[in-house]
Amino acid sequence: MTDIKFCGLKTGRDIAAAEAAGARWTGYVIFPKSPRHVSPTLAGELCHLARTSETVAVTVNPDDDLLAQIRDAMRPDWIQLHGSESPQRVVQARAYAKRGIIKALPVAEASDLDAANPYDRVADMLLFDAKPPAGADRPGGLGHGYDYALLKSLQISVPWLLSGGLDDTNVCAAVAAAGAKAVDVSSGIESAPGIKDAGRIAGFASALAAC
């Protein structure tokens, strides 16, 4: 069975739909440039609604002050670092926030996977996302995919998630190509940027279950 992280949730209805679809993780984005942004306070309120999923605070190059806000207001199970954080910063963030760390890494070509090695055993999990287009003002693939088969040759010891451009039409092929045991989806379950669709959430989970 392939585990799912439904990311960018903003309402209790989103959480209910994600957990009904079997989410292992639910993600809450704390980054003002994202259409999925929620404040640490709202993220904390949402986390209290999560009953069966592990909660993930998704951040981009957070300073210690923001990490403290997330830790205290949200109390997530995980913190996802989705910026240019160094391995040393990952170590510092884990020690400061006292939470498991998911480090996101951008992928466009095979050489990008070399960046994973310094984070192996430093982060608790890795997440491979599409490299953002040139000139983008925020990280992530922004709904775009990449050659998922590049991940088939990964040689790392920590668990990892496949992300970037996934939806119900391509998730089976992507998982097979990458050899992934867990996936992350956000824009692929939306009716508009930042607006989750319960039907698409259920459809994504059903498509993955049928692989």
Swiss-Prot record:
EC numbers on record: 5.3.1.24
Name recorded for this polypeptide: N-(5'-phosphoribosyl)anthranilate isomerase
NCBIfam families: PRK01222.1-1
One biological process term in Gene Ontology: L-tryptophan biosynthetic process
Matching InterPro entries: Aldolase_TIM, PRAI_dom, RibuloseP-bd_barrel, TrpF_fam
Pfam families registered for this protein in UniProt: PRAI (PF00697)
Sequence similarity: Belongs to the TrpF family.
Key words, A-Z: Amino-acid biosynthesis, Aromatic amino acid biosynthesis, Isomerase, Tryptophan biosynthesis
Reaction(s) catalysed (UniProt annotation): N-(5-phospho-beta-D-ribosyl)anthranilate = 1-(2-carboxyphenylamino)-1-deoxy-D-ribulose 5-phosphate
PANTHER family found in the cross-reference section: N-(5'-PHOSPHORIBOSYL)ANTHRANILATE ISOMERASE
Superkingdom of origin organism: Bacteria
Gene name per UniProt: trpF
Functional pathway: Amino-acid biosynthesis; L-tryptophan biosynthesis; L-tryptophan from chorismate: step 3/5
Enzyme superclass (EC): isomerase
GO molecular function: phosphoribosylanthranilate isomerase activity
